[in-house]
Amino acid sequence: VGSEMCIRDSHNMGFDAIDYLIEKYNIPQAGVKFNAMYGKGVIGGEKVILMKPLSFMNLSGGPVQEMANYFKVDPETELVVIYDDIDLDPGQIRIRKQGSAGGHNGIKDIIRRLGTEKFLRIKVGVGAKPKGWDLADHVLSRFADSDRRLVDEAIENAGDAVEKILSQGPDAAMNESNSKKP
């Protein structure tokens, strides 16, 4: 998940990872459907649909649910959501097979709309908000130069984790990615 209005901001990690995959695997945009841009291609020998909800971040569940229903995607076995996580250090990624929203309103809406917490997610660390900052100001801010390199690497690692999930399975991707330190 992300927002076209937050390009290169910490709240846009999902979109940045999708852009990385689009470029790396030459996946063309197929169009706009259900308030989401999407493209179809092949990654790790598997057919994929990459999508970017065009809704507000906190309403990402609608486009995800509608796209999953239309393309007959089983959220519990065929969906991967990539998003920012303030509980992880900048540059760190963490893959989980299920779990709560952890305070992320976009994920909360996806869980609500899908009716399950059981879907694969790749969290990209953006770091905790600085003391005295509003959370919204933090996630909508640009990265410090010192963190930008780490975050760019994490975006690539998140994209590469998608390929590993598709070619070797989620456990292999989790074993490799969850143990990496930025």
Task: Give short role names for the model-derived ranges.
Residues 91-182:
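Phosphate-binding/catalytic loops
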Residues 3, 55-56, 85-88, 171:
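Short glycine-rich anion-binding loops that position phosphate/pyrophosphate groups of nucleotides
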Residues 23-77, 81-82:
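Conserved N-terminal catalytic core of the sugar/cofactor nucleotidyltransferase
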